[in-house]
């Protein structure tokens, strides 16, 4: 009995230390969030240059696998700061997605494939509808995901929605067990985003994410925010338009 109690105490202590480490590792100051977004932007641009100009550089492709998970984590943290997801913020995402779609097509992507801003909009809309616990809104959320699925081939598909949902729930979790379970889900879903491309892409996405988060968590804690609120969607649409024009 004493041995069992000792083992239980040790397990609880390990779980507590892991939870404390997790919170220090994944909760960032406004400046740290902007650093992570900047790294993600650089990785995204490298990936898009490689794809749009057909450079076929493996290192650029692999580096780009870290962009979406980093954006997703920052998005989840930002969203969790409010008691409820705000519909006006979701509406802005829908609007920017529509604007960016023209640049997405100009950059050479199929017109019927939704850009990544739509993935964020769909995820936020589904989450807010599910939080209301209304039957018709739950049905609407399921319908929205079903409609998005065939249109999301270049934006991580349903796995991308899962990544966004897990990122949000991780920061909303109120107890240790839920946080640790969601961490396990996160470590599984990040490689799953790129598993269809190759094993190397799956590993690269996880490595780039963990490496970036680890380095940023150790520095910049007192750095204030330096990007304006809508910088990412504006930059996303503009960089696609510029690359699309240059590739003509």
From Swiss-Prot:
The keyword Transmembrane helix applies. The keyword Transmembrane applies. Keywords: Cell membrane, Membrane, Plasmid, Transmembrane, Transmembrane helix. It comes from Escherichia coli. It is found in: Cell membrane. Belongs to the TraX family. It is a multi-pass membrane protein. It comes from the Bacteria. InterPro entries: TraX (IPR008875), TraX_Ftype (IPR014125). This is Protein TraX. The chain crosses the membrane at residues 39-55, 180-196, 200-216, 232-248. The gene is traX. One of its GO terms (cellular component) is plasma membrane. Responsible for the N-terminal acetylation of F pilin. Pfam families: TraX (PF05857).
